[in-house]
């Protein structure tokens, strides 16, 4: 692309030479770009002489969490119950060692599992941090969950009694029966459940049950599907006083996929636990096929498929909107034409000094807006398929959030990524972040359109650049017509399984590095080239 090396050199020089002054300058109000400065050449070096601007005000977290009165800051004690069945016990038979193992996985600061696990020829490094590490990182140290581990509780029935699906392919009744039995057992042991309650609710009541989960073993519908829900429970104290409680619980399985010896990673637990914190699902909760071919967030969000990053051993970190929804960060609004830059999302924002990890583009509708954030392959984001500027659209509806049906309409998704390559397939996400090849802008007229719901922001984003750990971009109301994104031409690619059945059709500018739909042997064809790939 013309002038790219020249621009990057100028940008690097600008960033290095002004580093000592940048903090003070960021405190200055931003200046609008006069029409005379707007470029006719998108690579005009004059663009980079503009100083970073400060936006109008910080947007406060709104009503986006699905639960209220949940403690999300400070040190919070959470119950973690280990429960087995009369026909399925934990792989670790010694109760003391079992509790000791989960104590490390859930509470130990800096915990790392050095093991490499293998399934079907694919190797997965062990977890890169404890559950406590994960949530302290996502909250920038504001939320410190400490898990009080109890168990194992020996349930009276076999796993199928609690996991058997009903006519709607649901097992929620059986799961609630399991949680009720666990509560009865805890009460019989003398535990004061009311002591964990706040305003009549026991928050973050978590269960790890022995064995496998139906989420990765659909051939056995009697297994329990990991989930989160609420149970009404009556607790009687030592004086036999009746105390009604709401048990807000989550549950997840012990074992990894269909194995008998490999422990499950922390991804599924973090996903379900995040429900109890107030986050909904971002995948299509009605159609798995649509959730794959027309993904909302895919591997980019823990509340979509990101809980399975690295097989679930290294779940993806929260997006800016997820952090924002739980009150762990504010997102500055873009209010001026000018040059903006972002640190990566894993770094704590410091608005007073002008350090931001995300920006918000407002529309005329308060419930519809765009979020811009910088993602690097580091920490809990290390297994990302790409690095750069992530652009997501929010179209908030209280009913959709509370009903957990945000993205069931593929043509009207409520929270989703706007992929740079305009390809929403879950497994072709290497082209989702900006810049991607020549695509370094996203506008209200381009492809994909910079749009949230039916509303457009006042600004377009262009000249997106990556420089070391920073992302820089220009925001402007008056976009030159020749800065619009070109439509992706790319190459048509068809992927077949070993039986010759087409399993994926897509268009990409990088056919040699296409993401495949799961593990196995595939035949990939594009143009006159046919390749056999084992994944």
Write out the residue ranges for each language-model feature.
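A domain-level signal for the mature, folded cores of soluble proteins
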Residues: 157-173, 258-263, 276, 280-359
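Active-site recognition of the HExxH zinc-binding catalytic motif
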Residues: 267-282, 372
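C-terminal outer-membrane/trafficking sorting elements
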Residues: 481-535
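Active-site-proximal segments of metallohydrolase catalytic domains
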Residues: 61-70, 120-245
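Non-catalytic C-terminal accessory/binding modules of secreted extracellular proteins
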Residues: 23-39, 91-125, 133-140, 219-259, ...
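Hydrophobic h-region of N-terminal signal peptides that target proteins for export
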Residues: 12-21
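Primarily auto-inhibitory N-terminal propeptides
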Residues: 23-105
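Bacterial N-terminal signal peptides that target proteins for export
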Residues: 1-8
């Amino acid at each position: 692309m013309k002038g790219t090396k020249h621009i990057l050199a100028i940008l690097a020089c600008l960033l290095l030479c002004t580093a000592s002054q940048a903090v003070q300058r960021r405190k200055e109000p931003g200046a609008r770009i006069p029409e005379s400065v707007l470029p006719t050449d998108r690579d005009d070096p004059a663009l980079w002489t503009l100083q970073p601007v400060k936006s109008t005000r910080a947007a406060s977290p709104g009503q986006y969490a699905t639960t209220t009165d949940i403690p999300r800051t400070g040190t919070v004690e959470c119950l973690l119950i280990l429960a087995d069945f009369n026909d399925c016990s934990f792989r670790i038979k010694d109760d003391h060692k079992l509790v000791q193992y989960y104590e490390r996985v859930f509470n130990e600061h800096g915990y790392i599992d050095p093991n490499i696990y293998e399934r079907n020829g694919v190797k997965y490094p062990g977890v890169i941090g404890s559950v406590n590490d994960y949530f302290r990182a996502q909250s920038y140290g504001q939320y410190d969950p400490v898990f009080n581990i109890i168990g194992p509780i020996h349930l009276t029935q076999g796993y199928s009694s609690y996991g058997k699906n009903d006519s709607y392919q649901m097992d929620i009744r059986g799961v609630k029966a399991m949680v009720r039995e666990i509560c009865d057992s805890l009460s019989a042991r003398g535990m004061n459940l009311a002591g964990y309650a706040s305003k009549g609710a026991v928050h973050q009541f978590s269960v790890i049950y022995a064995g496998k989960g139906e989420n990765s073993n659909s051939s056995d519908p009697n297994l329990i599907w990991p989930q989160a829900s609420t149970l009404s429970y009556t607790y009687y104290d030592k004086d036999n006083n009746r105390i009604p409680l709401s048990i807000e619980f989550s549950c997840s399985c012990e074992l990894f996929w269909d194995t008998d010896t490999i422990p499950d990673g922390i991804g599924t637990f973090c996903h379900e636990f995040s429900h109890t914190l107030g986050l909904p699902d971002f995948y299509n909760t009605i159609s798995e096929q649509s959730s794959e071919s027309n993904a909302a967030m895919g591997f980019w969000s823990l509340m979509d498929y990101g809980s399975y990053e690295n097989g679930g051993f290294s779940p993806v970190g929260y997006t800016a909107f997820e952090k924002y929804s739980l009150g762990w960060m504010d997102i500055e609004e873009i209010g001026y034409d000018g040059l903006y830059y972002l640190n990566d999302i894993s770094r704590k924002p410091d608005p007073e000094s002008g350090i931001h990890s995300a920006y918000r583009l407002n529309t005329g509708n308060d419930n519809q807006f765009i979020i811009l954030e910088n993602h690097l392959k580091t920490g809990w984001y290390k297994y990302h398929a790409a690095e750069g500027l992530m652009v997501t659209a929010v179209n908030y509806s209280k009913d959709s959030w509370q009903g957990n049906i945000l993205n069931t309409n593929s043509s009207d998704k409520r929270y989703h990524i706007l992929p740079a390559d305009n390809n929403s397939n879950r497994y072709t996400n290497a082209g989702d972040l900006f810049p991607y090849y020549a695509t370094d802008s996203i506008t209200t007229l381009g492809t994909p359109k910079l749009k949230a719901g039916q509303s457009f922001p006042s600004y377009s984003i262009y000249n997106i650049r990556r420089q070391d750990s920073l992302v820089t971009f220009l925001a402007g109301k008056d976009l030159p017509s020749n800065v619009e994104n070109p439509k992706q031409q790319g190459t048509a690619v068809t992927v077949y399984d070993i039986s010759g059945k087409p399993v994926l059709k897509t268009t990409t500018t990088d056919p040699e590095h296409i993401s495949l739909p799961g593990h196995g042997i595939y035949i990939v064809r594009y143009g006159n080239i046919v390749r056999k790939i084992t994944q």
